[in-house]
């Protein structure tokens, strides 16, 4: 079974080597259990810091996007090197390169591809290209909520929802500025819908239980395409 794992840039912001160790062992466990895994990394605070500085001196959005892409690729290299023999030793810079690297039978790790496109959209595209029926979005909360649980304490996790439900939740909260993409953007939603890809949103601090989460035995949110 093929799956794509989208790792939030916030994973890298914690500067916690244990995160990388747990990720490596989780990928090893998935591989042992018959999964083919692709990984897409976000840019995190590295991307935001460079984008902020560049925006303040008047650099245009397309160039800011490039800074974010390069930051996400730096994170991809970190993950790729940490996986050692599990990974194919190349970070693809386009969908075509991803497809070629995927054919080698190892874990492929990538960051962003092109300006105007979030790493969530990249994750949806590579899920589609690799015939993966599940896209796992690993972020710093347990799943999807009606409002941001880091801001509001009275919100409940939504264990099951559709892409249409997700659109309503995200309505008005999405920005197209470089460095501001969250969860799934409209393009990512369209891609998972057209290829009927299930999305599992989970906490990256629970990667060591990812197989249980994929089985529905742990807390997460499952988004079904409509």
From Swiss-Prot:
Its EC number is 2.7.4.22. GO terms for biological process: 'de novo' CTP biosynthetic process; UDP biosynthetic process. GO terms for cellular component: cytoplasm. Pfam families: AA_kinase. UMP binds at residues 43, 65, 113-119. InterPro entries: AceGlu_kinase-like_sf, Asp/Glu/Uridylate_kinase, Uridylate_kinase, Uridylate_kinase_arch/spir. GO terms for molecular function: ATP binding; UMP kinase activity. SUPFAM superfamilies: Carbamate kinase-like. ATP binds at residues 6-10, 44, 48, 139-140, 145, 148. Disulfide bonds: none annotated. Keywords: ATP-binding, Cytoplasm, Kinase, Nucleotide-binding, Pyrimidine biosynthesis, Transferase. It catalyses: UMP + ATP = UDP + ADP. It comes from the Archaea. Pathway: Pyrimidine metabolism; CTP biosynthesis via de novo pathway; UDP from UMP (UMPK route): step 1/1. Its main location: cytoplasm. It is found in: Cytoplasm. Inhibited by UTP. Homohexamer. NCBIfam families: pyrH_arch. Catalyzes the reversible phosphorylation of UMP to UDP. Belongs to the UMP kinase family. This is Uridylate kinase. It comes from Saccharolobus islandicus (strain M.16.27) (Sulfolobus islandicus).
């Amino acid at each position: 079974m093929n799956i794509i794992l989208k790792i939030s840039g916030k994973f890298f912001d914690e500067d916690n080597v244990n995160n990388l160790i747990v990720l490596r062992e989780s990928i090893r466990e998935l591989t042992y259990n018959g999964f083919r895994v692709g990984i897409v990394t976000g840019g995190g605070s590295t991307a935001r810091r460079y984008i902020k500085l560049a925006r303040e001196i008047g650099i245009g959005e397309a160039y800011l996007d490039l800074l974010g892409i390069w930051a996400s690729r730096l994170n991809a290299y970190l993950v790729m090197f940490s996986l050692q023999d599990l990974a194919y030793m190349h970070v693809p810079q386009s969908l075509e390169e991803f497809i070629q690297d995927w054919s080698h039978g190892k874990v492929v790790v990538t960051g962003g591809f092109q300006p105007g496109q979030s790493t969530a959209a990249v994750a949806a595209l590579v899920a589609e290209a690799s015939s993966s029926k599940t896209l796992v979005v690993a972020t710093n909360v347990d799943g999807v909520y009606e409002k941001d649980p880091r801001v509001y304490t009275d919100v409940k996790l939504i264990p099951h929802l559709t892409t249409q439900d997700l659109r309503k939740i995200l309505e008005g909260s999405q920005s197209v500025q470089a460095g501001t993409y969250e969860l799934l953007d409209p393009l990512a939603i369209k891609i998972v819908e057209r290829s009927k890809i299930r999305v599992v949103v989970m906490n990256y601090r629970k990667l060591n239980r990812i197989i249980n989460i994929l089985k529905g035995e742990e807390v997460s949110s499952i988004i079904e395409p409509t």
